[in-house]
Amino acid sequence: MSRSTKTIRTLAVSLALALATTACAPGGSTTNEPAANSSASPVSKDVSAAGDVTLTVWDQNTDTGINDAQVELNKQFQQKYPNVKIERVSRSFSDLKTTLKLALTSKDPPDVVQANQGYPDMGSFVSGGLLRPEDDYAKLYGWDTYFPEQQLNLNKFTADGKDWQSGNLYGVSQTGEIVGVYYNRKILKNLNLQVPKTITEFEAMLPTIKASGMLPIAYGDVEKSPGIHLYGITQGAIAGEQAVTELVTGRSGAWTDEPSVKAAQTIQDWATKGYITEGANGISRDDALAEFGKGKSAFVITGTWEQPKVIKSLGADGGFVALGPDGSDTPVTTGGVGLAWSITTGSKHPDVAAAYIDFITNANASQVLIDNGNLPAVAPENWAPKAGTLQADVANEWKRVNTGSGGLVPYLDYATPTFYDTLSAAVQQLTAKKLTPQQFAEQLQKDYAAFLKSK
C-alpha cells in the first residue's frame, strides 16, 4: 500500500481535526509553582555546552517494537552527543501512572517523562507546577510546524491545569495510535467468515466462532486499561464519533444515555455468553495477546502499539480492522497520539532534555519507529507498507479513521481527573457481572457530573 508524504501529513491533520473538537524513579525541588510561561533564560540547541550530563528519562515504551525503537534512538542520541548519558527508567503504562507523580515531586525528579494527556495526569502535573512549558523549544526546533496544530493541542493546558487543549505546550508525541480488532486470517477463512467492518457484523460472527470450539475474543484486564479500550471501541461503534467526543469533552450528553448503556450491555453479554476469556480480570493483557498469537482465539481487541507482537506471532495470518456503526463507511474508534514527551520543572538540563525529545520524535525517529513496526505521529516521506501485511492494515485503518467526517474519539479516561480509576474499575465489575449496565453507567455519570460541577 503506497502513501505519499502529502497523504501522510493529511492524515495527521485529519487526526487533529477529529480530536481538536474533542478533547493510552529519579529524575529539583519538591514544591513548584505553576509556570505560566517558559523559562526566562534563553534556550539553545548547543548540547555540548552543558558538559557531561546524565539525563534521566522515564518512559512507558516497554512493549516489543516500541522498546526496540527506543533503545536504538537512545543509542543514536548518545553517539551524536557523547557528553550525554541516558539513564532510562521504563515502566508499564499502569505502573507509570501510579509512580510518576511521586517521582516528579521527589528531591531528584527525572528530566524527561512521558505524560498521559488529559486531566488525570498531565492536567494534575501542570497544576502542580511539575512540567515545564515547551513553547520556546517548539519554536527553536520547529515542532510548531512539524506537528499539526491539532496534534499539539492535545498536549496543551492552561497553566492552572484546568483547561485542556489550550494554553501552553507541555510536550510532543512520538507515535500515532488507534484501538481496533486484531484478527487471525486463517481462522476466519476456515470458518468462511469475512473480515467484519461494523459492530453488528463483528457480533454476528461470535456465536459461529464459539460453536466451532474456538474462543472468539482473547481478553485480559488485570492491568485495567484494556477495559477502557474494550468499552471505548464498543461505545464508539454504537454511539458514533460526535456523541462520544462531545461526552468526553463535557460539551453534551451523559454516560447514562441509551447508546452508552447499550455498549455496556453488549460487553456484559459477551462475558455471559463466553465470547471473551473467562476470569479476564485475573489475566494480563500480555497473556491474552499471547493466546491470540498461538491461534487460540479469533480476535483480540487492543491498540496499534501491539502490532510488532502480532507480526512476530502470526506473521501473514495477522490482520487489523477498526469497527464502525451500522450504515457507516467510516470506522469509529478510540485513539489519538502517544503519551507526550515532557520536560520537568526540576530538570537542571532543559536544553539537553529538549534536544533529546526532538531527536526521538523527528523524521529520522519516525523511520526508526516504522522499521520496528510502529505507527509514527508524523510519517516520513514515501512510506509504503507492503500490501496485504498487518502494517498495511494498520496504515489503512489509520487513514479510514482520519478521512471524511472522521471517526476518531479521544481516550475515555481523559474525561475527568478521576475517570481512569472510575471507568477501569467499573468495566471489571461489568464483565464480572457485579454491576448491571445501568449501574455501570450511573457510576460513570456520578464522577463526570461532579467534575463538570467543579469547573
Predicted regions and their residues:
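Short helix-initiation/N-cap motifs at beta->coil->alpha
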Residues: 90-99, 199-204, 279-293
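Hinge/lid segment of periplasmic solute-binding proteins
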Residues: 120-178, 319-321
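Conserved N-terminal structural module of periplasmic/extracytoplasmic solute-binding proteins
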Residues: 2-130, 195, 327-329, 368, ...
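Glycine-centered hinge/linker elements that transmit conformational signals in sensory
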Residues: 208, 249-281
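Extracytoplasmic/periplasmic substrate-recognition and gating elements
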Residues: 79, 191, 273, 312-376, ...
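Extracytoplasmic/periplasmic solute-binding protein
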Residues: 160-174, 179, 203-253, 297
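C-terminal capping/gating helix-and-loop segments adjacent to ligand/active sites or protein-protein/ligand interfaces
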Residues: 246-249, 376-381, 395-449
